[in-house]
Amino acid sequence: MSGNHNLDNTTFLPLVAAAAGTVLIAGVFSAAAVALDEEDGERATCQNIGIAAEVISSNLLDGRSKRHASNGSGGHGEKKPRRYVCWDRQRAKLCIMNDYLGSQPSFGPEDFKRVFRVSWRTYNQLRNYLCHVQPFFRPGFDATKREKVSTDAKLLIALKYLAYGTTVNAFRDYFQVGESTAMKCVKLFTKEITTSPFRQEYFRSMTQGDAKRVEALHTAVHGVRGMIGSLDCSHIVWGNCPVAHHGQYQGKEGKPTIVVEAMVDYTLYAWHAVFGYCGTLNDVTIWDNSLLLQAMCDGSFEDIDFPFNIGGEVFQQLWMLVDGIYPPLSRFVKPISVPLGETEALFSLWQESKRKDVERFFGVFKKKFNFFAKPVPFFLWRTF
C-alpha cells in the first residue's frame, strides 16, 4: 500500500474491544503510544471510534444480519409491494458541502468535530485511506447512469451512527440514502478500520520508550515518578439486551450491563482495554481473568520497567493507581481506607483525585459514543 494513503500516527489511534454473535466475548487489546502533544484529546476521541468499529465488525463475523420481512400479520399472507424512492443524491451532496466540507461552509471545524466526533484533518485522512482500499467508498455511477451516493455521505453516515447509536433511518432525509445502503456504509467502514494495516501499529504492546514518555507526562502533571496510568472498571447499561441474557448480564445495578476495563493515562489514551464482560462480574473477578495480570505473572511486563528515584530511593517497577477493591500488588497504589494521621489522609486525597483520569475516560467513552449502549442491531440471525 502506498505511504500516501496511511493515516497520521498522531491523529488516528483506534483501540478495539470484542463482541461476537449473540453472546459478547471479552477481548483484550493493548494500544500504542505516540508523541504526547497538543493533539492528545483528538487522539483519545479517535480511539473511541475505533472501539465502536471493532464492536460492530466483530458482530458481523459468519452469518447474515437479522431481517424482518413481514407485514402487519406477522409474516403470513400477501406481502406489501415495495415502494420505489427516488433519492436526491445531488441535493444531499450539495448540503454536505455547503454545511461542512465546502470552501466556505456554514459550520466551522469545531461544529464538524462536535457533530461527527472527529476533526477535519482526521476525516480527510480516513477518506483518502478508505477510498484507496475499498471500492464501495469511491465515487462513480450506478447501472442507470446516475451518480452514486457521494463518498462523504457514506463516511459521515458511519461516523454519525457510531456517535449517536440511533437507527440509520434517522439520517436518510439529510443524506438521501436508503436503509440497506446506510447499513452497508457502517459495516464496510468498521471492517476496513479494524482489518487494516493499522493493527500492527496501534494494537501492539507498550514498549519501554512508550512507558518513558507516559511516565514523564505523569511526573509533570501529577508530580510523582513511576506512574503509567490508572486502572478501573465501569458498567455500561445494555438497553437492548435480549431477555434470555438478562440473568447473565444483570448485576448489582438492577439492569443488564456490559463491563469495560481500562488502564489509561492523563490524556485519556487507553493502554489496555476490555469490553464485553458480563454485568454480574465485579472488578476482582474481571482482574482474575485479565491479560494484564497474565503479563505481570509471566514477566513480560518487566520489559517496559526502568529505574526511577522517589525520595532518594531507587525503584524498578512502574505502577498504576487503582481503587481499594483490587488485590495488594507491588504495581498497584491503592488509597488508605483508614488513614492514621495527616500524612496518610493527604495521600488518600491525592490518590483519589489523580485516579480520576480513568473516570474521565469512562465518561467520555459513554457520553460521546452512544452506540455502546445499543449493540443489538448488528446481532446475527443464523439459518441452517
Q: What are the roles of these predicted feature ranges?
A:
Residues P139-V149, E342-A345:
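Short, conserved non-catalytic motifs in the polymerase core
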Residues S2-N9, T167-F384:
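Short, well-ordered secondary-structure "scaffold" segments embedded in the functional core
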Residues M1-F141, P197-F198, F203:
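Charged, often Cys/His-bearing segments associated with DNA-binding zinc-finger transcription factors
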Residues T151-Y164:
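Short, amphipathic alpha-helical "recognition" segments used to contact nucleic acids or chromatin
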Residues R114-R117, A143-V149, L159, F275:
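Short basic-aromatic helix/loop recognition motifs at nucleic-acid
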Residues Q125-L126, I157, V214:
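A structural signal for short hydrophobic/aromatic patches embedded in well-ordered alpha helices
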Residues R127-A143, G165-T167, K366-V376:
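Structural recognition of short helix-loop-helix hairpins that underlie histone-fold modules
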